[in-house]
């Protein structure tokens, strides 16, 4: 799986964390997955036959979809703010 560089990861965590020590809330996890998905999508545009990476991308998208579904049911307002901030829904 493709990982983000530590500076980019810390920047995303600081932007989406709920409190100072928050690194694992659903919002942060979704934001990190979205960044990894965008990075891997760019990779697959350059390397369209990389099917192993494509499978990893599909797994990440599925994991993000499940987390978004959970967030939509538990905290609908936070869900709407998050998708608007990330620009992942219409």
Curated annotation (Swiss-Prot):
Pfam families in the record: Ribosomal_S15 (PF00312)
GO cellular component terms, A-Z: cytosolic small ribosomal subunit
Gene Ontology BP annotations: translation
InterPro entries, A to Z: Ribosomal_uS15, Ribosomal_uS15_bac-type, uS15_NS1_RNA-bd_sf
CDD domains: Ribosomal_S15p_S13e
GO MF terms held by the record: rRNA binding; structural constituent of ribosome
Superkingdom of this protein's organism: Bacteria
Keywords: Ribonucleoprotein, Ribosomal protein, RNA-binding, rRNA-binding
Family named by the database record: Belongs to the universal ribosomal protein uS15 family.
Oligomeric form and interacting partners: Part of the 30S ribosomal subunit. Forms a bridge to the 50S subunit in the 70S ribosome, contacting the 23S rRNA.
Role of this protein: One of the primary rRNA binding proteins, it binds directly to 16S rRNA where it helps nucleate assembly of the platform of the 30S subunit by binding and bridging several RNA helices of the 16S rRNA. Forms an intersubunit bridge (bridge B4) with the 23S rRNA of the 50S subunit in the ribosome.
HAMAP family: Ribosomal_uS15_B (MF_01343_B)
This protein's name: Small ribosomal subunit protein uS15
Organism the protein comes from: Thermotoga maritima (strain ATCC 43589 / DSM 3109 / JCM 10099 / NBRC 100826 / MSB8)
């Amino acid at each position: 799986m493709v990982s983000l560089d530590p500076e980019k990861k810390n920047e995303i965590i600081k932007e989406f964390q709920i409190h100072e020590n928050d690194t694992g809330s659903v919002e942060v996890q979704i934001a990190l997955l979205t960044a990894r998905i965008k990075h891997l999508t760019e990779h697959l545009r350059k390397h369209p036959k990389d099917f192993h990476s494509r499978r990893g991308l599909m797994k990440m998208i599925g994991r993000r979809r499940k987390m978004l579904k959970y967030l939509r049911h538990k905290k609908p307002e936070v869900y709407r703010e998050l998708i608007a901030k990330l620009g992942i829904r219409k």
